[in-house]
């Protein structure tokens, strides 16, 4: 990989290391010192300090990981290219017109009759949020969460096992006990234990808050809330408690409005000014 060729370049690494190691005596300011030290540490963390044999082995592992991640993504995308067919418009009750039109267009593209809820988040989430047919909510939700886990040619379990094994090999080669230790080294938490401690502190209040939300949903639904019910009844609660409808917010998040807001905040916060170039002009 190109990144390995850069990281394993001994002359480049030694130059970066020399700058970082001598930062205190070379007159670098705090920002320059920080950049040099982080660059050196990143090179070391990715194998620059290994001997030739170690670099060769790490290169093999990194290539295998890259291939595994590509294969994983291809399998998930293949499952996302499937869809749930809805043959009756009654199955679309509750959906906004824009989502109905998108489902109809998806069906035409795939040469199927009716409407197609494609197995992607952009198609599934609106359906789970607005469609009234609970049986279809369950069907669409289960299909979505089972991407890459159907025991067929697109099943990812063996690929995941391969990735886990390769990550462990890489961690050991770089002097870490496991992938989590290697991954957390360059974070604020520093260690897996510290990260886990933070998550456990957040877990109890987060769980309590979700329980409150589910109780509100159950009060409206009149039955126990299942995973495929969550988005639908969250929207119902939002409407009942706050008189807030997602569809009423959409005009405010139209592309040009979002872009204008982004430019406005960039100017307010950072002093950046954006001006449209004449057609065909090139900025220098």
Regions found by a protein language model. Name each.
Residues 1-182:
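Noncatalytic, helix-rich "gating/capping" subdomain that lines the substrate-entry/channel surface
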Residues 31, 35, 67, 74, ...:
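Active-site-proximal, well-structured secondary-structure segments within enzyme catalytic domains
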């Amino acid at each position: 990989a190109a990144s390995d060729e850069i990281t394993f370049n001994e002359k480049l690494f030694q130059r970066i290391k020399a700058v970082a190691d001598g930062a205190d005596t070379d007159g670098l300011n705090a920002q320059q010192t920080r950049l040099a030290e982080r660059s050196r540490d990143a090179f070391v963390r990715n194998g620059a300090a290994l001997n030739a044999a170690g670099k060769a082995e790490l290169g093999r592992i990194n290539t295998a990981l890259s291939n595994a991640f590509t294969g994983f993504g291809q399998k998930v995308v293949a499952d996302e290219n499937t869809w749930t067919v809805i043959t009756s418009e009654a199955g679309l009750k509750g959906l906004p017109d824009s989502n109905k039109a998108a489902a109809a267009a998806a069906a035409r593209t795939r040469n199927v009759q009716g409407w197609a809820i494609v197995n992607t988040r952009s198609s599934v989430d609106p359906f789970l949020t607005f469609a009234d047919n609970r049986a279809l909510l369950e069907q669409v939700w289960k299909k979505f969460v089972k991407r890459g886990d159907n025991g067929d040619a697109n099943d990812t379990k063996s690929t995941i096992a391969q990735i886990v094994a390769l990550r462990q090999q890489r961690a050991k080669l770089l002097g870490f006990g496991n992938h989590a230790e290697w991954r957390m080294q360059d974070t604020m938490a520093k260690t897996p234990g510290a990260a886990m401690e933070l998550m456990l502190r957040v877990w109890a209040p987060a769980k309590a808050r979700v329980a409150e939300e589910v109780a509100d949903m159950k009060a409206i639904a009149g039955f126990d809330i299942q995973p495929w019910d969550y988005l639908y009844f969250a929207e119902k609660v939002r409407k009942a408690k706050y008189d807030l409808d997602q569809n009423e917010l959409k005009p405010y998040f139209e592309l040009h409005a979002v872009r204008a807001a982004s430019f406005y905040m960039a100017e307010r916060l950072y002093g950046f000014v954006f001006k449209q170039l004449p057609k065909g002009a090139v900025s220098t």
